[in-house]
Curated annotation (Swiss-Prot):
One term of GO molecular function: RNA binding
PPR repeats: 73-107, 109-143, 144-174, 175-205, 206-240, 241-267, 268-302, 303-333, 339-369, 370-404, 405-435, 441-475
Keywords for the protein's UniProt record, in alphabetical order: Repeat
One Pfam entry name: PPR_2
Protein name stated in the entry: Putative pentatricopeptide repeat-containing protein At5g37570
Family: Belongs to the PPR family. PCMP-E subfamily.
One BP term from GO: RNA modification
Span list, region Type E motif: 476-550
Keyword Repeat: yes
């Protein structure tokens, strides 16, 4: 087709650009344009720039083509700015605007400023965005509805509600997009009452405004009102459904999440992702894999978030065979996913499923190891009885200049508990509070209680619970009761059990543990009394279950 292009029309060029598969093709088209003496045709060059701005290297090539035009007009400048703005390249976009102003040969117009504000808002560049706003006021484009809306959107995304409302109030003309931008601004700042008020005042609502308010209610945890608004929507799209699916999943209601997923039409990768992640996060790994299989059967290509959810499900199951299958699947397609998200999850999955050699290899190959990857390796080591190695890795992490946070200390304290390393655990507990000024959380205290309980230091564990600056949660008391069962201490066990009966009145676990302690001491009357109490309260022991991989 390139060879037959003797005198290209704009239409034939657009068709030709769509067929381009590589930068080599673009070079061939450009060479043909030069040979035909059409390099100064600004309409033609604008199409070339728009079509060749798909990657950073292509953008660089577009810029070189632009440079060959002696006096580019505003239309051509806008196409170049659009290419960089669509890639969210802040410095390059603003630099082109400044250069355009300096030349004096072309003036920015109502199409220029929204492109620049898009990249300013995405990068949170409040100062530069405000300066551009001042430029708009001087030039006189502030009355344009598209320009005004872009500033409402900008200030809203930067959480400057005063400026967003001020720009909106001064706009002589507003459309549905302008109103939606202000609704979104209030939603992003957590001002849901104000968002609802603006939504109610809208003369004409569009799908974006409905979706923004539904999503805001979902993210605030108000699923009841979110569903009520969702049901009132005159029209819904996959964004509407995905917000609700994600909300139900985060709230633990996977039945409602699945029902909405089945109801939605044209589900895309985001909806599949919300459902798979929901099952994984709610401890239903088999369902997560089942949905993934359904997705693959429909030829939907997974993104990195889906793969992270799948690996989380695999980690929960601890299934070596499934781990190998997921790892192999990713290994063949790694270039399609962001390693920033995928590799730490891949390390975590392999470590927790017992594939420590593979986890270690991935860990060592990381160009820059972070806190998440270190924690994944330490957890895996602890699960498989390598507590001392996990501690050495923690020390290596600190030596490399990575500062441990409260999650990292939770991990290392769990490591010490699982490996019964009392001195090390107590040392890290003090180090966390004194050197790193991290306030001990209920989870941190629970880890120490577990460590002391496992090693028979039951009185120390009990005294620690009583000295906590907050009410101990059930996991701390449960760890101590488990220690009492392990070491046969009835006196402390009875005190601990009473606390657990109050905290978790419908949990059979505490009754069963105390019953086992009595049984080990042949106190069958007490065993019978406990079972009668369970029956009176309608408490039943949940039968154990095993994972079976197919």
């Amino acid at each position: 087709m390139i060879q037959r292009l003797s005198h290209p029309s704009l239409l034939s060029l657009e068709t030709l650009f769509k067929l381009c598969k590589s930068e080599i093709h673009l070079n061939q088209i450009h060479a043909r344009i030069i040979r035909k003496g059409l390099e100064q045709d600004q309409n033609l060059i604008s199409i070339f720039i728009s079509s060749s701005s798909s990657s950073s290297s292509s953008l660089s090539y577009s810029s070189s083509v632009f440079e060959r035009v002696p006096s580019p007009g505003t239309y051509l400048w806008n196409h170049l700015i659009k290419g960089y703005s669509n890639k969210f390249l802040f410095f390059e976009t603003v630099s082109i605007l400044m250069r355009m102003m300096r030349t004096g040969l072309a003036r920015p117009d109502e199409y220029t400023f929204p492109l620049v504000m898009k990249v300013c808002s995405n990068n949170g560049q409040v100062r530069v965005g405000s300066s551009v706003h001042g430029l708009v006021l001087r030039i006189g484009f502030d009355k344009d509805v598209v320009v005004g809306t872009s500033f409402v959107d900008f200030y809203g995304k930067c959480k400057d509600l005063f400026s967003a409302r001020k720009v909106f109030g001064e706009m002589p003309e507003r459309n549905a997009v302008s109103w939606t931008a202000l609704v979104v601004a209030y939603v992003k700042s957590g001002e849901l009452e104000e968002a609802k008020s603006m939504f109610d005042l809208m003369p004409e609502r569009n799908l974006g405004s409905w979706n923004a308010l539904v999503d805001g209610l979902v993210k605030s945890g108000d699923l009841v009102n979110a569903k009520k608004l969702f049901d009132e929507m005159p029209k819904r799209d996959i964004i509407s459904y995905t917000s609700m699916i994600d909300g139900y999943a985060k709230g633990g209601d996977m039945v409602s999440a699945r029902d909405l997923f089945e109801e939605a039409r044209g589900v895309d990768v985001r909806a599949w992702s919300a459902l798979i992640l929901g099952y994984a996060q709610n401890g239903q790994p088999n369902e997560a894999f089942k949905v993934f299989s359904e997705m693959c059967a429909k030829n939907v290509k997974p993104d990195e978030f889906i793969m992270v959810g799948l690996m989380s499900a695999c980690s929960q199951m601890g299934c070596f065979e499934l781990c190998e299958k997921v790892d192999s699947y990713l290994h063949q397609r790694m270039n399609k996913f962001s390693s920033h998200y995928v590799v730490p999850a891949l390390i975590d999955m392999n470590a927790k499923c017992g594939h420590m050699d593979r986890a270690a290899k991935l860990f060592e190959e990381m160009p820059q190891r972070d806190l998440v990857s270190y924690c994944s390796m330490m957890e895996g080591m602890a699960i498989h009885g390598c507590g001392s190695e996990a501690i050495r890795l923690f020390e290596k992490m600190v030596d490399e200049g990575i500062v441990p946070d409260e999650v990292a200390f939770t991990v290392i304290l769990k490591v010490c508990g699982q490996s019964r390393l009392v001195e090390e655990g107590l040392r890290y507990f003090e180090l966390m509070r004194k050197k790193y000024s991290i306030l001990a959380s209920p989870d941190h205290y629970s880890c120490i209680v577990n460590l002391l309980s496992r090693t028979g230091k039951l009185k120390e564990a009990y005294e620690l619970i009583k000295s906590m600056p907050f009410e101990a949660h059930a996991s701390a008391w449960g760890s101590l009761l488990g220690g009492c069962s392990l070491h046969g201490n009835t006196e402390i066990a009875e005190v601990v059990a009473r606390h657990l009966f109050e905290l978790e009145p419908q949990s059979a676990g505490s009754y069963v543990l105390l019953s086992n302690i009595y049984a080990a001491l042949d106190r069958w009357t007490d065993v019978a009394h406990l079972r009668d109490k369970m029956n009176e309260n309608g408490i039943t022991k949940i039968c154990g279950r095993s994972w079976i991989s197919r």
